[in-house]
Curated annotation (Swiss-Prot):
Disulfide bonds: none annotated. Homotetramer. Belongs to the beta-eliminating lyase family. The gene is tnaA. Pathway: Amino-acid degradation; L-tryptophan degradation via pyruvate pathway; indole and pyruvate from L-tryptophan: step 1/1. HAMAP family: Tryptophanase. This is Tryptophanase. It comes from the Bacteria. One of its GO terms (molecular function) is tryptophanase activity. PROSITE patterns: BETA_ELIM_LYASE. The modification N6-(pyridoxal phosphate)lysine is found at residue 270. Its cofactor is pyridoxal 5'-phosphate. It is an enzyme of class 4 (lyase). Gene3D superfamilies: Aspartate Aminotransferase, domain 1 (3.90.1150.10), Type I PLP-dependent aspartate aminotransferase-like (Major domain) (3.40.640.10). It comes from Haemophilus influenzae (strain 86-028NP).
């Protein structure tokens, strides 16, 4: 299939879900009813849903078939051992705990690592700081409700949508080490490496950067947890962009990457392609105590440690999905779909972040320069996109970032982005063309789009349930 300008989707569509078309008037009323928050829209009112790629895509026939093997035993399920074997084979990690999704893993490991640091190193909870290349929203939320100050240490190119860099998800290693020294290593219970880096635009982290980060972590005896939702996409970018690994397989790159962490927390609803599921895993004997403490907490919060909130069939499906999500031709198609969408948007003058994995990220701050950050330009753009075309997207900016839990002040956000998240094996090139045409219509009316202000603001993870209105 070489030398073709464009290759179609590398799969056949066997089952379809009908969607309804709505009028502009209907969508305007739906948006008002939702409090100008697309999270609160009903899915039946969405024509193209780009809110997230988390559990919203198709599954493979092998994944669906695997569910028939499910062992629903309460403890010691053979389906658990199938999942644990997949984790060992792919990542090299000895200890596996299934969870219902990624935040289930976070609510377990975060308090355990904090308590361990306090017990062994004398951590002062009032001075506790945790670091990441950029925390995902729920990881940030769980860290904050456990009393930690979160610090994102990213490279200067990360949020410059005009800059080109092969690995915009990288840690700024100098800032990381300086931050640890300023906080005191004993007050840093963990470092989280997010791959790919969602908030920066699905941007990858190089293996060279992983090595440097892990060397710093080892120097100060700080455990590293890999936030692994998009581990396969990151491996694909390493293969395509990091010279030393151009001849490695996705499987080889993945295994190598996870040498530079002590544990992983995964929302398996992304690259593992399942509609529900998560994983918490630890590398070796050095993390055995943490593993056992997490198992105990799992019983209270998720379920018995050999099912962790998942039925046996779901664990079987996840074990297969971990492998299916790493297929070379699948990843090449998926990234090409993002690149096609970004190129089309930029061609009509819509500014975007450099193409990464899983989504196109529109620079709403540049598209709507008349709306200040505290009136959430990307959220306003999201509302307008829905009203124009029935497309639901998600804000990745000041609205999502939220307030400092100690001062109550809005946290400064490096960019105001609108994420157009592409569910796996769900939308075709025709859908991408429709999205581009919709943005052309939005752009024509951009100067008339109004900023937003709160009518209801939750204290934690406000972007999920907040309600807003237009600023008059």
């Amino acid at each position: 299939m070489e030398n073709f300008k464009h290759l179609p989707e590398p799969f056949r569509i066997r089952v379809i879900e009908p969607v309804k078309r709505t009028t502009r008037e209907y969508r305007e009323q739906a948006m008002l009813k939702s409090g100008m928050n697309p999270f609160l829209l009903d899915s039946e009112d969405i024509f193209i849903d780009l809110l997230t790629d988390s559990g919203t895509g198709a599954v493979t026939q092998d994944m669906q078939a695997a569910m028939l093997r499910g062992d629903e035993a309460y403890s010691g399920s053979r389906s658990y051992y199938a999942l644990a074997k997949a984790v060992k084979d792919i990542f090299g990690y000895e200890y596996t705990i299934p969870t219902h999704q990624g935040r289930g893993a976070e609510q377990i490991y975060i308090p355990v690592l904090i308590a361990k640091r306090e017990r062994e190193k004398g951590l002062d909870r009032s001075k506790m700081v945790v670091f990441s290349n950029y925390f995902f929203d729920t990881t940030q939320g769980h860290s904050q409700i456990n009393g930690a100050t979160v610090r994102n240490v990213y490279i200067k190119e990360a949020f410059d949508t005009t800059a080109k860099h092969p690995f915009k998800g990288n840690f700024d290693l100098e800032k990381l080490e300086k931050g640890i020294q300023e906080a005191g290593a004993h007050n840093v219970p963990y470092i989280v490496c997010t791959i790919t880096c969602n908030s920066a635009g699905g941007q990858p982290v190089s293996i060279a950067n992983l090595k440097g980060m892990y060397e710093i972590a080892r120097k100060y005896d700080i455990p590293v947890i890999m936030d692994s939702a998009r581990f396969a996409e990151n491996a694909y970018f390493v293969q395509q962009r990091e010279e030393a690994y151009k001849d490695w397989t996705i499987e080889q790159i993945t295994y190598e990457s996870y040498r530079y962490a002590d544990g992983l927390a995964m929302s398996a609803k992304k690259d593992a392609m399942v509609p529900m599921g998560g994983i918490l895993a630890f590398k070796d004997k050095s993390m055995e105590e943490v593993y056992h403490e997490c198992r105990t907490l799992c019983v209270v919060q998720e379920g018995f440690p050999t099912y962790g909130g998942l039925e046996g069939g779901a664990m079987e499906r996840l074990a297969v999905g971990l492998h299916d999500g790493m297929r070379q031709e699948w990843l090449a198609y998926r990234i090409a779909q993002i690149e096609y969408l970004v190129a089309g948007l930029e061609k009509i003058g819509v500014p975007c972040q450099q193409p990464g994995g899983h989504a196109a990220f529109v620079d709403a701050g540049k598209l709507l320069p008349h709306i200040p950050a505290d009136q959430f330009p990307a959220q306003a753009l999201s509302c307008e996109l829905y009203k124009v075309a029935g497309i639901r997207a998600v804000e990745i900016g000041s609205f999502l970032l939220g307030r400092d839990p100690k001062t109550g002040k809005q946290l400064p956000c490096p960019a105001e982005l609108l994420r157009l998240t592409i569910p796996r094996a769900t939308y075709t090139q025709t859908h991408m063309d429709f999205i581009i045409e919709a943005f052309q219509k939005v752009k024509e009316n951009a100067e008339n789009i109004k900023g937003l202000t709160f009518t209801y603001e939750p204290k934690v993870l406000r972007h999920f349930t907040a309600r807003l209105k237009e600023v008059e």
